[in-house]
Amino acid sequence: MKSAVETLNPTRVRLTVEVPFEELKDSLDAAYKKINQQVTVKGFRKGKIPARVIDQRFGRGAVLEEAVNDALPKFYTEAVNEAELNPLGQPEVDITELKDGETLNFTAEVDVRPTIEIPDYSGIEVEVDAVEVSDEDVEKAVTELRERFASTSPVERAAEDGDVVTLDLEAKVDGEVLEDGVAEGVSYTIGSGELLDGIDDAVKGLEAGGETTFTSELKGGSAAGKEAEVTVKVSQVAARELPELDDDFAQLASEFDTLEELKADSRKRLENMKQYDQATQAQERVLEKLLELAEVPVPEKLLEDEINTRKHNLEHHQLGQMGLDLEKYLEIQGKTVEEFDAETKEAAVKGIKTQFVLDELVNKEKLNVNQEELTEHLMRRAASSGMSPDQFAQAVVEGGQVPMLVGEVARGKALAVVVEAATVKDTNGEIVDLDDEDETESTPETTEAAEAAEESTEDKPEA
């Protein structure tokens, strides 16, 4: 076999392959054997039909077609390996010449990973939010904790903001009660915004036994996005009573003895949360700068497939679970189809570029993933998917997606290398030190930042 490669553009090549006919012998033998098992000829036992009889009865062309179909993947793979290519997706194969007893010639066009020059990233500078926790932040956190320990007691008066009401609901569209539009005994805190638009105004002022009707656009269910006539009946009004903010409350709501200790712990927790957000922000902005510096051509077919994958995942998984179609989703978002398509393409391009650049950086820095890192990442992914670690691991193995997880961790480590080399300042002009670990150690934040940019570039395990 002889092969040559022609570069059509930075992301696509054409392989030209010439195969001497004698190298098709194994495939021809396999073709005769396969046809032997599929056909019957009077006078011959199944599987014992001579080759010349098959040629006479079914045509030599049928045998050659079967042999070529069997041989093409092998010769294509050999040509790819000889040229040291990294193909993306399936090739477009064209048989240019097939002469019985002489030769098989074909071409194969395929997208390939582009050659990427990793830029000097040591000069990257980004700005992030400063970690600042005010007294008001602490008071808000303590108040939210206090709200969780509130008690309720029924009252004989009209409902008002902050009350907990027990409701019976019935929704009609075009005069018909929806199958999924009836609910009884729903507990709702007035002002929380957790139910339908307009329900707060509807129930305020009603006492137990009171009933009213209002209109609201349904956000989910079988009639999502439609205007519904909602009848609401109040069966109980209960006032919420908050515990006193004192040392007794601190002992009730936490492991601390005093309110001051509880507030100090709340401040520390808020600082930790803001530091986490700050680190994530730094990683996302460093990645954006890196992608701006790198020249990364994107294969057209890969981009097309990625856009289609993202749209499919949105329509058939995310929106399907919400009871929405794409048209209604865009209406809620206030976007046109053109705006949605542009945003989807932009996200797909970023995802592909992120994977290409970080993969190249993994190779350049010779980064490896050990078993402990892979296990930790698997545990995080399992938790975020709502599956147990064992279930998630089984889904990954059965789906042949272990290399995908390894790639995610490796790219997280590559991003960590770039973040380590970057200068990160907060909005106060202070240098932010994110170097709590070895520079080549991936953190949950760097891995998640890389994943967020890639999003659906690779298949994900399904529950």
From Swiss-Prot:
The reaction(s) annotated as catalysed by this protein in its Swiss-Prot or TrEMBL entry are: [protein]-peptidylproline (omega=180) = [protein]-peptidylproline (omega=0)
Q: Which residues form the PPIase FKBP-type domain?
A: 162-243
**Where does the protein end up?**
Cytoplasm
Residues annotated as region Disordered? 427-463
Any Pfam family hit:
Trigger_N
Supply the alphabetized keyword list: Cell cycle, Cell division, Chaperone, Cytoplasm, Isomerase, Rotamase
Q: Name one GO cellular component term.
A: cytoplasm
Acidic residues bias locations:
432-442
Q: Does the keyword Chaperone apply?
A: yes
Can you name this protein? Trigger factor
Species of provenance = Streptomyces avermitilis (strain ATCC 31267 / DSM 46492 / JCM 5070 / NBRC 14893 / NCIMB 12804 / NRRL 8165 / MA-4680)
